[in-house]
């Protein structure tokens, strides 16, 4: 995956993980999974509900947070320069 893709994914998933936000994850086959994001890496998301499931990112269509989440995609140098 390109570095540009990580600039959106990582801060978003990290905010969901840090704040223990309940999420609905829709898979490409239409199945809906619910829980909290426990961890993630380049290829998978660990979703915790009654059990922890490893969900491959290529199978994910949409992640819907249960509430609004604030996350920043600005790099520290960009934030300081006002860009």
Swiss-Prot record:
InterPro entries given in the database record: Hfq (IPR005001), LSM_dom_sf (IPR010920), Sm (IPR047575)
Any single biological process term in GO: regulation of RNA stability
Entry keyword RNA-binding: yes
Molecular functions per Gene Ontology: RNA binding
Keyword RNA-binding in annotation: yes
Entry's Gene Ontology cellular component terms: cytosol
Record keywords: RNA-binding, Stress response
Signal peptide: none
Source organism, top-level taxon: Bacteria
Residues annotated as domain Sm: 10-69
UniProt-listed PROSITE patterns: SM
Function: RNA chaperone that binds small regulatory RNA (sRNAs) and mRNAs to facilitate mRNA translational regulation in response to envelope stress, environmental stress and changes in metabolite concentrations. Also binds with high specificity to tRNAs.
Oligomeric and partner information: Homohexamer.
Family to which this protein belongs: Belongs to the Hfq family.
Protein name, UniProt field: RNA-binding protein Hfq
């Amino acid at each position: 995956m390109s570095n540009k893709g990580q600039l959106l994914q990582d801060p978003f998933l990290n905010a969901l993980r840090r704040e223990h936000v309940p999420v609905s994850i829709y898979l490409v086959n239409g199945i809906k999974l619910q829980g909290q994001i426990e961890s993630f890496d380049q290829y998978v998301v660990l979703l915790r509900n009654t059990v922890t499931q490893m969900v491959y990112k290529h199978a994910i269509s949409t992640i819907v947070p249960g509430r609004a989440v604030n996350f920043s995609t600005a790099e520290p140098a960009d934030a300081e320069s006002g860009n």
